[in-house]
């Protein structure tokens, strides 16, 4: 009876119809450190062809690197051309590059506000527009934005950062409505309080205060973010579009 049950289970799994794995050409912007690096390494370990952008630091071992400033259209085009020559047109774009320049609203200059929007939101638009050309032709594409709980909750002193991250959600949903019929989807992974160079630089009072809102009562690690990205990049996620997946220990509770 045990053998029969095992055999039936195996047959059921085989008949389930899960799509076969396909190795894709992946580009992770800002993939040379922190969350971006963890994502790039995870996707490379899964046998995808992975390239990362950096701003002069070079690529980590095992990854193909291209220098790129996402605030510069010409630099974006050059980076994509290099990636295309190395591993083919980008099929999975992980838009992760970004900056933060926090300040009280009344002290935040327009220059500081605009600088963050340009890097985090307009930069994402630039790389998306460039990637979408070949994705539409191939009728396959996965666009994954690395957002933030800040873009859903709003966090004090981050009017610029929160606005940019919230904008990614609207952009992903607009793109999904426009391009899903061509096999191109856009989704957002929204990390919460993750241990990175950026969060370590925050005031200790802010770090301590953040834990009060996290049911898990701990800071997340960069290694806990790539799983959601891997899923959205996979064949299994073909019918998911315009979604926001929080990776925040329950901090935002889906807001």
From Swiss-Prot:
**Tree of life domain:** Bacteria
Query: According to its UniProt record, in which pathway does this protein act?
Result: Lipid metabolism; mycolic acid biosynthesis
- Quote the subcellular location field of this record: Secreted, Cell wall
Which EC number(s) are documented for this chain?
Answer: 1.1.1.100
Role: Part of the mycobacterial fatty acid elongation system FAS-II, which is involved in mycolic acid biosynthesis. Catalyzes the NADPH-dependent reduction of beta-ketoacyl derivatives, the second step of the FAS-II elongation cycle.
The record's section on NCBIfam families has: PRK12826.1-2 (NF009466)
Task: Identify its protein family.
Answer: Belongs to the short-chain dehydrogenases/reductases (SDR) family.
In Swiss-Prot or TrEMBL terms, this protein is called 3-oxoacyl-[acyl-carrier-protein] reductase MabA
Protein source organism: Mycobacterium avium
């Amino acid at each position: 009876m045990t053998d029969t049950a095992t055999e039936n289970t195996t047959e059921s799994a085989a008949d389930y119809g899960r799509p076969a794995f396909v190795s894709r050409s992946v580009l992770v912007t800002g993939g040379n450190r922190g969350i971006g690096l963890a994502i790039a390494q995870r996707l490379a370990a899964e046998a995808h062809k992975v390239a990362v952008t950096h701003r002069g630091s070079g690529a980590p071992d095992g990854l193909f690197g291209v220098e790129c400033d996402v605030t510069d259209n010409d630099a974006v085009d050059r980076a994509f051309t290099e990636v295309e020559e190395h591993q083919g047109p980008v099929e999975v774009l992980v838009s992760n590059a970004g900056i933060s320049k926090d300040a009280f609203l009344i002290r935040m200059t327009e220059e500081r506000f605009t600088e963050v929007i340009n890097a985090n939101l307009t930069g994402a638009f630039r790389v998306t527009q460039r990637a979408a050309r070949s994705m539409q032709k191939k009728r396959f594409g996965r666009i994954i934005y690395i957002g933030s709980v800040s873009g859903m909750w709003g966090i004090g002193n981050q009017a610029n950062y929160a606005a940019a991250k919230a904008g990614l959600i609207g952009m992903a949903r607009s793109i999904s409505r426009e391009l899903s019929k061509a096999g191109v989807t856009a989704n957002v992974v929204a990390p919460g309080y993750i241990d990175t160079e950026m969060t370590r630089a925050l005031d200790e009072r802010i770090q301590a205060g953040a834990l009060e809102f996290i049911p898990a009562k701990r800071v997340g690690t960069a290694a806990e973010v790539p799983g959601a990205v891997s899923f959205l990049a996979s064949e299994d996620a073909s019918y998911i579009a315009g979604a926001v997946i929080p990776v925040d220990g329950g901090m935002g509770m889906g807001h």
